[in-house]
UniProtKB/Swiss-Prot annotation:
Its EC number is 4.2.1.104. Belongs to the cyanase family. SMART domains: Cyanate_lyase. The keyword Lipid biosynthesis does not apply. It comes from Glycine max (Soybean). InterPro entries: Cyanase, Cyanate_lyase_C, Cyanate_lyase_C_sf, Lambda_DNA-bd_dom_sf. The lineage of its organism: Eukaryota, Viridiplantae, Streptophyta, Embryophyta, Tracheophyta. PANTHER family: CYANATE HYDRATASE (PTHR34186:SF2). This is Cyanate hydratase. The active site is at R90, E93, S116.
């Protein structure tokens, strides 16, 4: 399975490279975020049937036989060696360093809960800092999910026998 995914990803990356387009250009042409386009081309996200024609228009050399493959639920995995890449390592370091404070602010602003990584949008943007140097802006836009008190009376599997829904 991983081997097949690696082959498909290599093909998708070649199509993107040969197009000469950036993820930002593809995002603009498809109406998706730049990170989501990258996720699609790495088989980390599922291509929506309504989006397929937009992606095909943005990447005319995308082989037709890859489109149905991109519409299948992907195996969302990653190479464990990826952490050795300096950018990925620094992202992990930033989340670990600021994570506890971010969690505390989420709890303070919203209550006991978390940010969804399923109902989630992500983008990477470039801006100039006050010193005139380039800066990276990462936006994580996730739905707030409150934790719930686990009352037995609300546990459907206990109130209705399994198979008799």
């Amino acid at each position: 399975m991983e081997r097949k995914k690696a082959k498909i990803v290599a093909e998708l990356q070649a199509v993107k490279h040969n197009s000469g387009k950036s993820y930002n250009q593809l995002a603009e042409e498809t109406g998706l975020t730049n990170v989501y386009v990258a996720q699609l081309l790495r088989r980390q996200a599922q291509l929506n049937p309504q989006t397929a024609p937009l992606l095909r228009a943005a990447l005319p050399d995308l082989p037709q036989d890859l489109v149905p493959e991109m519409m299948r639920p992907p195996l969302r995995s990653y190479d464990p060696n990826l952490i050795q890449d300096p950018t990925v390592y620094r992202l992990n370091e930033a989340v670990m360093h600021f994570g506890e404070s971010i969690k505390e602010i989420i709890n303070e602003e919203f209550g006991d809960g978390t940010m969804s990584a399923i109902d989630f949008y992500c983008s990477v943007d470039k801006i100039k800092g006050v010193d005139g140097k380039d800066r990276v802006v990462l936006t994580f836009d996730g739905k707030y999910l409150p934790h719930s008190e686990q009352k037995s009376e609300h546990m459907v599997s206990r109130t209705r026998p399994l198979g008799k829904q």
